[in-house]
Regions:
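Charge-mixed, compositionally biased segments that are often intrinsically disordered regulatory tracts
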Residues: 1-41
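Two-metal-ion acidic nuclease core segments, chiefly of the RNase H-like superfamily
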Residues: 118-136
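C-terminal accessory extensions appended to soluble enzyme cores
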Residues: 93, 161-228
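Acidic, metal-coordinating catalytic cores used for nucleic-acid/nucleotide bond scission
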Residues: 105-118, 139-145
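Electropositive, glycine- and tryptophan-enriched low-complexity nucleic-acid-binding patches
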Residues: 41-104, 109
Length: 228
């Protein structure tokens, strides 16, 4: 993993990013620990939240840039790739020289390399945007080394001791956190995502012909090349 990351960071036409979803935030007057300068009354149980928001983050380690998408639906394979596509639409003019995206991610249930819908959506992404995607997964119990995890710790400390009693409050705290002196770009995602979407075995076999898996480590390192 270190070799792949270092090679990506040293290659002019390659951009490395880290993607992950934070734990879902329950909206309501709930205690979240931490301290506040003012007295805040909070419920000590978080039953029946008014809504939920799951922050999905895309972090550029070499540029210290963070993008957060507040998702109000399920974080599915489709959701993750939609966030990736929305991010790329907003930045690709800046990165017109980039031909490869190296993506650091953990081996979660919605984004592992055997997740059929995730892989199909990434193949579609590569075909549409004409940019190669290299997936570099952290193995089990090592997701804490995924660079974006450090950002989630900062965000958690930033809003601890406060009441996240509305979606707007969650987004406002996300916008005012800082990473190396910079605020993240924050968007709200209100699309509805269905769970359990998957391909048939035959359809996935066709997708596999468009993937290049590293021998002996095919679950952890996958290239999706731009078709000729």
């Amino acid at each position: 993993m270190n070799r792949i990351n270092q090679a990506a960071d040293a290659t002019e036409d390659t951009l490395r990013l880290s993607i992950d979803a934070k734990a879902t935030v329950k909206i309501g007057p709930f205690s979240r620990g931490g301290k506040s300068r003012i007295q805040v009354a909070a419920a000590d149980h978080d039953f029946a939240p008014e809504a939920t928001v799951t922050p999905v983050g895309i972090f550029l380690p070499t540029l210290a840039e963070l993008f957060i998408y507040g998702v109000t639906s399920h974080v599915t394979s489709d959701c993750l790739v939609d966030c990736l596509a929305q991010w790329w639409e907003t930045v690709r003019a800046r990165f017109s020289h980039i031909t490869t995206l190296v993506v650091n991610l953990d081996n979660g249930p919605e984004n592992h390399s055997r997740r059929t819908q995730f892989m199909q959506r990434l193949v579609d992404f590569v075909r549409h945007y004409r940019v190669t995607v290299r997936l570099a997964y952290y193995p089990p119990y090592h997701s804490k080394y995924n660079p974006i995890e450090r950002c989630w710790g900062i965000l958690e400390n930033h809003w601890n001791g406060t009441l996240l009693d509305s979606i707007d409050a969650v987004l406002a705290f996300a916008r005012t956190m800082t990473w190396q002196g910079r605020h993240p770009v924050v968007h709200l995602v209100t699309a509805t995502y269905e769970t359990g979407v998957k391909l048939t075995k035959d359809a996935m076999q066709q997708i596999e012909t468009q993937l290049q898996r590293l021998p002996a480590l095919g679950k952890w390192f996958v290239d999706i090349m731009v078709p000729v």
